Amino acid sequence: MNSIEFPLLARTTQNSVISTTLNDLSNWSRLSSLWPLLYGTSCCFIEFASLIGSRFDFDRYGLVPRSSPRQADLILTAGTVTMKMAPSLVRLYEQMPEPKYVIAMGACTITGGMFSTDSYSTVRGVDKLIPVDVYLPGCPPKPEAVIDAITKLRKKIAREIYEERIRSQEENRCFTTNHKFHVGRSIHTGNYDQGLLYQSPSTSEIPPETFFKYKSSVSSHELVN
């Protein structure tokens, strides 16, 4: 083999051999087979019915919905999360195997929505309970937006490094806290503000001649009727 054949051999070898790392291979296998756990509590969850249909067909992305968190690596939260449901959501997330991802779908999941204005039992954003990878705003988001969020998550999985994700989760871990109500001093004493109440004059303050004159006029009126 002479020196002229070396470049041809190098080009042939480069076109025939795929060079990659175990990390890239792992990311490729995970982004092509996401198994989501659907956690829906409100109207945003209805949009998933359109995704299952033939028009959008989210099975082409390798999505296989699971009913058990131990078999899922993606959880899609849709709808309002209340204080009572917060421990259940955190428990489901902790039961999912690593690596795991979260998509927050809808305004109620991201910020609490319109229910967080006057409600004391609504969580103001699911990211206060579990780490969120992709935020999907809308009320409700369209099925096309859900597919776009899944596409962005696939791109994120393709370029992430597993060791760095584990390290960041250990440093920025979300701990659950019990919601406790503290009994404070009551501001209601049971006494009404006399200045705000209308007090009718008592009979002792009315002159006798006025009182008897009024009583006689009422009696004569009743007799006429």
From Swiss-Prot:
Transmembrane segments: none annotated. It comes from the Eukaryota. The keyword Magnesium does not apply. The keyword Zinc does not apply. Its cofactor is [4Fe-4S] cluster. It is found in: Plastid, Chloroplast thylakoid membrane. Signal peptide: none annotated. GO terms for biological process: aerobic respiration; electron transport coupled proton transport; photosynthesis, light reaction. Belongs to the complex I 20 kDa subunit family. This is NAD(P)H-quinone oxidoreductase subunit K, chloroplastic. It comes from Eucalyptus globulus subsp. globulus. The gene is ndhK.
